[in-house]
Amino acid sequence: MRLIPLKTAQQVSKWAAKYIVDRINTFAPTAERPFVLGLPTGGTPLQTYKELIKLYQAEEVSFKYVVTFNMDEYVGLPKEHPESYHSFMYNNFFNHIDIQPQNINILDGNTDDHDEECRRYEEKIKSYGKINLFMGGVGVDGHIAFNEPASSLASRTRIKTLTEDTLIANSRFFDNDVTKVPKYALTIGVATLLDAEEVMLLVTGHNKALALQAGVEGNVNHFWTISALQLHRHAIFVCDEPATQELKVKTVKYFTELEQRAIHSVLD
């Protein structure tokens, strides 16, 4: 496990974007051997997408041979709805880079057969071998994608009922009206995430501090989905200072010293 303790959320976004670009460029993808990137939605990664667009515009990276898989999508929300994750991804990222449309994969929450859609998604991921890097965010209760507390750590892509806490948290995108938030979503499973070669979680803000503490110092258990990343062979938590406030001082000190070079790659 790596923990990258930075000062601000802006530094988190820059570090994450640079890391993604470095991984893509080192991989040197081709049409026959694309780089497979897992992506989230939500407020936390939004600035990272802006940083990635800047790096693309500066010709530091191309997404032509990058294949993407998104984490989740609401059930029953039309793709063209402004709060669908299809709309989010195209408006905030895909429309601004050179990714090929056929390389974009997002779950279809409007299909008549949700189980078949989830099975198809898993098979599509397997057809590429693996996801090379999965970027994600985390909820205040430690959920990743829509793997809410008590989700099976062996779960695969499936339909999930959203918790009341998630409905309330997401209502800010629906005129603060909980009744407008879809009650169900299709989401990758915890095991789907753990299958990725690398997982990078962005954790910012004091409201995420308990989740980060559970992920780094807590025991592995299904009530804190984030804790499953302790089982991953290459998990990276990129966090700002407020998010580290529930960690032990010696934990932060240890990773700060260990990751000096990585930290200064953003600060310099």
From Swiss-Prot:
Allosterically activated by N-acetylglucosamine 6-phosphate (GlcNAc6P). It is an enzyme of class 3 (hydrolase). SUPFAM superfamilies: NagB/RpiA/CoA transferase-like (SSF100950). Keywords: Allosteric enzyme, Carbohydrate metabolism, Hydrolase. Its EC number is 3.5.99.6. One of its GO terms (cellular component) is cytoplasm. It holds the Pfam family Glucosamine_iso. Pathway: Amino-sugar metabolism; N-acetylneuraminate degradation; D-fructose 6-phosphate from N-acetylneuraminate: step 5/5. PROSITE patterns: GLC_GALNAC_ISOMERASE. The active site is at D72, D141, H143, E148. The record marks S151, R158, K160, T161, Y254 as: Part of the allosteric site. GO terms for molecular function: glucosamine-6-phosphate deaminase activity; identical protein binding. It catalyses: alpha-D-glucosamine 6-phosphate + H2O = beta-D-fructose 6-phosphate + NH4(+). It comes from the Bacteria. Transmembrane segments: none annotated. GO terms for biological process: carbohydrate metabolic process; glucosamine catabolic process; N-acetylglucosamine catabolic process; N-acetylneuraminate catabolic process. Catalyzes the reversible isomerization-deamination of glucosamine 6-phosphate (GlcN6P) to form fructose 6-phosphate (Fru6P) and ammonium ion. Belongs to the glucosamine/galactosamine-6-phosphate isomerase family. NagB subfamily. Homohexamer. This is Glucosamine-6-phosphate deaminase. It comes from Histophilus somni (strain 2336). The gene is nagB.
